[in-house]
Curated annotation (Swiss-Prot):
Catalyzes the formation of the alpha-1,6-glucosidic linkages in glycogen by scission of a 1,4-alpha-linked oligosaccharide from growing alpha-1,4-glucan chains and the subsequent attachment of the oligosaccharide to the alpha-1,6 position. The keyword Kinase does not apply. It catalyses: Transfers a segment of a (1->4)-alpha-D-glucan chain to a primary hydroxy group in a similar glucan chain. One of its GO terms (molecular function) is hydrolase activity, hydrolyzing O-glycosyl compounds. This is 1,4-alpha-glucan branching enzyme GlgB. SUPFAM superfamilies: (Trans)glycosidases (SSF51445), E set domains (SSF81296), Glycosyl hydrolase domain (SSF51011). Belongs to the glycosyl hydrolase 13 family. GlgB subfamily. One of its GO terms (cellular component) is cytosol. The keyword Zinc does not apply. One of its GO terms (biological process) is glycogen biosynthetic process. Monomer. The active site is at D399, E452. Pfam families: Alpha-amylase, Alpha-amylase_C, CBM_48.
């Protein structure tokens, strides 16, 4: 009678590649009270040799690639190694214990495993003193899962994983593997189809178009402990973000700078320009350059386009050493249809949302995630926790939140299925975003979350406890749209669009807002910021300086996409560096210097950031001069402050040697910033000493200017401020109220 390990059914499953529990058959098995047996499977091998406690022995050959060697009772995995056909001598993968435990299983299938990135994927480790790599993957509908790579000739039958739970988690420890090993998953689906897949939990990948996963050794020695300890104190400080696409900021010898080359250059530039943070367009791995990183296939992996895993850690560490925070763009709303990645992962739509008639997102032709599955939510949650824990990022900007919140986003009637209450809200996505924010803020206080959300969905930045989503900041897309819409209008038409400037103040404090001029506004025919401005070159540059000043003065945190700070002329393209040579031209030099000084003033002025989410931080002075396009307001650090900043914006092209503003009683008024300074390329007007006028004198001036009739007694008289108002400029004054 054949020994049990030659059971026909077991062997057939193993040979046919459908064995889901190879650990039960292979490795060290008990044969009798006094004897164990080492059972090996080597498809295609004629002989197999085993080194047992220093002695080389030939294993018995059975059939169909099964080999065995009788050994004394109590042999351990460390006691023997197996010779492979390529000459490799390694320990037996199937002799080592499985480590995925009940707690792992419970947390993962509940969607709450907060260190899943240390369990799933390829994890270098040591078991019983033997180094190697532990492979774990979730594929509940696969008949068989194997890890394939250079180490086994990419042969799917050599290293099948063991199914450790009835919910589809597979595991195998491969001794002797080290960092740098390349691998993929080979799966047999329920229908018998063989699939080759990249690892969703892979920490690094070969350069595109290769999709091979790479084992990494996370041994970087960080030097930013002081930054991390102080990070929570910075959350209420100024926030002036420089949005950067790594591959097109600056090139060298016709190629983008790598992470290490970029680190010092970008850090010094940000310090010089007084930016507090950089926000990186997605550096998660992605197959298509033209997606800018927003179609992610490696949610746990930095893209290899610009260097190694450790190189990106060095970049972030360097930014922290220079006092610059790092925010990561992250895309949990959809993923690409590329067959090598997550789509149809185990032969079924494992990660995909399938309840709509078409599974593809109509805007991007991508799949949306199924947030009803705890394992999918845990995959996404684990990704963001990985970037915070292992890569030390300081903030997460969630892309396309609106597409997550609404089931009908981009879809017409009949193309979507309502929620259980008959509504359009994606209740599972809402629950996930609440979990996302709750976990981050509890586990990593000081790490900030940002929502790119373009609708009026309520309570984006309200705490989860109060029924909100729990984000720290929401991108103010309405402000950005209205502001740029106004600036694109030629000067004669602007009086008819003054509401573009005033309307955003009606909702400016309904959320904690960030004011962006982002990459999306300088591509696809929208023109660069300077290209949006009407008029001749002088007026265009004056308007850009005015725009940058307007953004700095408005309530909300700041974000500017690279190139806007010096008047990049062409639209942005990911396939070339910014046009840095423009800084040899005086107009561009002027904008650059103006941006630098505006940023410095912002960082140094608590009136512009300390309470910018509160209505008490903003008070209108005047927005009635629609014809000339003048608005003015005060900014306060707190409601009771006597010190304030007076911000005056002139969106027209006229020059007013004497312009009278109604104002609260003032003790002093001093000019801090004038974007019409000749140093910035301006006309040099606006520097006359402002005159504070009592109500009586102010009334006389208004009568003389024809603004009111001499016998007009309507309304109370107010103080006045007589300033020199240059064309197309922002003026910022420091004022002391009586």
């Amino acid at each position: 009678m054949d020994p049990f390990f030659l059971n026909t059914q077991h062997v057939e499953l193993l040979v046919s590649g459908k064995q889901s529990s190879p650990q039960d058959l292979l490795g060290i098995v008990s044969e009798s009270l006094n004897q164990d047996r080492i059972v090996l499977f080597r498809p295609g091998a004629e002989t197999v040799f085993v080194e047992l406690r220093g002695k080389i022995q030939q294993a018995e050959s059975h059939h169909s690639g099964i080999f065995s060697l009788p050994v004394m009772k109590g042999i351990s995995p460390q006691d023997y190694r197996v010779y492979h056909q390529n000459g490799l001598l390694a320990h037996d993968p199937y002799a080592f214990p499985l480590l995925w435990g009940e707690i792992d299983s419970f947390l993962f299938h509940e969607g709450t495993h907060q260190r899943i990135y240390e369990r799933m994927g390829a994890i270098p480790c040591e078991i019983d003193g033997v180094p190697g790599v532990r492979f774990i993957v979730w594929a509940p509908h696969a008949q068989r899962v194997s890890v394939i790579g250079d180490f086994n000739g990419w042969h799917g039958l050599v290293n099948p994983l063991h199914k450790v739970s009835d919910q589809g988690v597979w595991e195998l420890f491969v001794p002797g593997l080290t960092a740098g090993a390349c691998y993929k998953w080979e799966m047999v689906t329920e229908s018998g189809q063989v699939l080759i897949k990249s690892d969703p939990y892979g920490k690094f990948f070969g350069p595109p178009p290769r999709s091979v996963s790479v084992v990494i050794d996370d041994s970087y020695e960080w030097t930013d402990s002081e930054w991390l300890e102080e990070r929570i104190k910075k959350t209420e400080g100024p926030m002036n973000i420089y949005e950067v696409h790594v591959g097109s900021w600056r090139w060298q010898e016709g190629q983008p700078l790598n992470y290490r080359e970029l680190a010092d250059q970008l850090a010094l530039y940000c310090k010089q320009m007084h930016y507090t943070h950089v926000e990186l367009l997605p550096v998660t791995e992605h197959p298509l350059n033209e997606s800018w990183g927003y179609q992610t296939t490696g949610y746990y992996a930095p893209t290899s386009r610009y260097g190694s895993f450790e190189d990106l850690q060095y970049f972030i560490d360097t930014m922290h050493q220079h006092g610059i925070g790092v925010i990561l763009d992250w895309v949990p709303g959809h993923f690409p249809i590329d067959s090598f990645a997550m789509s149809g992962f185990d032969g079924t739509p494992l990660y995909e949302y399938t309840r709509n008639p078409s599974p593809l997102h109509p805007h991007w032709h991508t799949y949306t995630f199924d947030y009803a599955k705890p394992e999918v939510c845990n995959f996404l949650l684990g990704s963001v926790l990985f970037w915070i824990d292992k890569m030390h990022v300081d903030g997460i900007r969630v892309d396309a939140v609106s597409s997550m919140l609404y089931l009908d986003y981009g879809r017409y009637a009949g193309e979507w299925v309502p929620n259980r209450y008959g509504g359009r809200e994606n209740l599972d996505a809402i629950r996930f975003l609440q979990q996302f924010n709750t976990v981050i803020h509890e586990k990593y206080p000081g790490v900030l979350t940002f929502a790119e959300e373009s609708t009026t969905f309520p309570k984006i930045t309200v705490s989860v406890e109060e029924g909100g989503l729990g984000f720290d900041y929401k991108w103010n897309m309405g402000w950005m749209h209205d502001t740029l819409h106004y600036f694109e209008k030629d000067f004669p038409y602007r009086p008819y669009h003054q509401s573009d400037l005033t309307f955003p103040q009606w909702y400016a404090f309904s959320e904690r807002f960030l004011l962006p001029f982002s990459h999306d506004e300088v591509v696809h025919g929208k023109r660069s910021l300077i290209g949006k401005m009407p008029g001749d070159a002088w007026r265009q540059f004056a308007q850009l300086r005015l725009l940058l000043g307007y953004q700095i003065c408005q309530p909300g945190k700041k974000l500017l996409f690279m190139g806007g700070e010096f008047g990049q002329g062409r639209e942005w393209s990911p396939g070339r560096e910014l046009d840095w040579e423009l800084l040899d031209i005086s107009y561009h030099q002027g904008v650059h210097l103006c941006s630098q000084e505006l940023n410095a003033l912002y960082v140094q002025s608590p009136q512009l950031w300390q309470a910018d989410h509160l209505p008490s931080s903003f008070r209108w002075v005047d927005f009635s001069d629609v014809r000339n396009g003048v608005v003015a307001y005060l900014r306060f650090a707190d409601a009771d402050a006597k010190k304030a900043l007076l911000c005056v914006h002139h969106f027209g092209v006229g020059y007013f040697p004497h312009y009278l503003l109604p104002i609260l009683p003032l003790e002093s008024c001093d000019l801090l910033m004038n974007t019409d300074d000749t140093r910035f390329g301006g006309s040099g007007k606006g520097f006359r000493e402002p005159e504070i006028l009592t109500p009586e004198i102010a009334r006389q001036e208004r009568e003389a200017a024809g603004l009111i009739e001499a016998d007009d007694e309507s309304g109370p008289d107010c103080w006045g401020l007589d300033i020199e108002l240059p064309p197309s400029a922002t003026l910022i004054f420091s004022v002391t109220l009586q």
